[in-house]
Amino acid sequence: PIQGCKSETAYADECSLGHQYNPAELINPISALSGKPPKRVPVTNWFFDLPAYESFLKDTVRSWEGDPRYRVGLIKTIKEFLRKPAIYVKKELLEEVQEIKTMPAFTVTQEPQKASSALVFADLTHRDQAVSLLEEHKIRYRTGKTLVPFRLSGNVKWGIPVPEADGVAGLTFWVWPESLWAPISFTKAYLGDGIEGRQWEQWWKAEDAQAYQFIGEDNIYFYGIAELGLFHALNQGLRMPVIVPNHHLLFGKTKASSSGSVKPPKAMELLEQYTPEQLRIHFMNASLGEKSVSFEPKALLQQDGAFDTILYEGNLVTNVFNRLVRSCFYTLQKHCNGVYPAGTVTEPVKARSDQVILEYERLISQFAFDKLFELLNLYLRDANKDWSRRAKSEDPAEIRQLLIDMFHIVRVAAALFHPIVPDGCEMIREYLHIDERLWDWQYIFEPLRFFMAEDH
């Protein structure tokens, strides 16, 4: 029943555009389990008064504009829900609507290219009154996106029990509000906080704490609207998460869904065929912030003869980066007996590396992970070309300088790759026999010699 939604297979609580609605608003609902129309039974539930926090949400979204951490699609989608309550009726039915004497006050907005007119109301109460009147007069309508009370509970038997209050008992929390505070529960469980522990607060309340939530674009309503309103209303000092919506990851050419005919692969199925590092670097380069992307694991789709695209990004590490690392260690052993040479990194290599570090930091702050891959790819391929050119020298001093320069690139690349492919990078650190300060961002511009004693 939502303007713009054409889905006939939506869940009972939301349309495919993410809008929440009441069961009474459904048009000819049919149960997916029984194939029969469901019975409407009066129930009592708890709701969060989300519309009461409209001003807070508007101020919050306004503060995000111009901040590169917040994607344009996120802001646009949230703004769609911050409109006044509206009803859409066909333009040819507008005269019938205006003849209903008891209709609450509304203003009409029309767009020439649209078949419907929008009836805009002052508040949700007036809109709901109008809905009842339209149904009474058998006038077809659709409701528009707006803030509505957010349901907290349900009457299914499984789930987390809602504490009894005001004589209401026997309810369980609805899955969506539970999922909003679940990351806090996970944090408490991971830290071993128990019920009364406070360690979790340093991750959710401390001034330097910041949670980032990477979500599907169809869940913006829950994490970008309901969660922010709920956390603010609790007034317990929770830091608002940064919401990072992404487009759909298609399985092959199809949008997979646990409720659809095409099911997404389970994590264990993927891990039986690929390493976590292969998957992580592949997803990093997927450009999901810009468009829906096809995920085509050859091992699961059984594509005979085709190149496995999941391995493409990993080849940057296993081939290009690994080639540079092996060249450095083998040459160090051959020409310097495994002792790191004294000297400083040449200015062009140091300047280029510093530039890459700063660009990496900028891209990370904007979640531009695909651009990150391009940056590191070019950095390492240029280093390999430089190695091929300079390694031909027979001058021992030039070879020592080559090692200092290339080990600096290895040191920088290992630190930048560490969040993405930690296992391989940890192996490099162990071969270098240096401590974990290598990963500390406050030392990111330091040369390799900084982490070593003399004659290392």
Locate each region found by the language model.
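Non-transmembrane, amphipathic alpha-helical segments
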Residues: T309-L316, V345, E361-K371, E398-L402
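Basic, alpha-helical terminal appendages of large translation-related enzymes
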Residues: P1-H19, P23-A24, P29-S34, V97-M103, ...
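Amphipathic alpha-helices that form helix-helix packing interfaces
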Residues: F321-L324, C328-T331, R352-V356, Y360, ...
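Short acidic alpha-helix initiation/capping motifs at coil-to-helix transition points
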Residues: A52, S258-K263, A351-S353, D405-I409
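Secondary-structure edge/capping motif, primarily at the C-terminal ends of alpha-helices
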Residues: L332-H335, V339, Y360-F367, A383-E394
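Non-catalytic interaction-recognition regions
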Residues: M284, G343-K350, Q355, R362
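Acidic/His metal-coordination segments adjacent to aromatic residues that form catalytic metal sites
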Residues: S257-P264, Q302-F307, D354-F367, K392
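Structured secondary-structure scaffolds
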Residues: G4, I30-K334, L372-L376
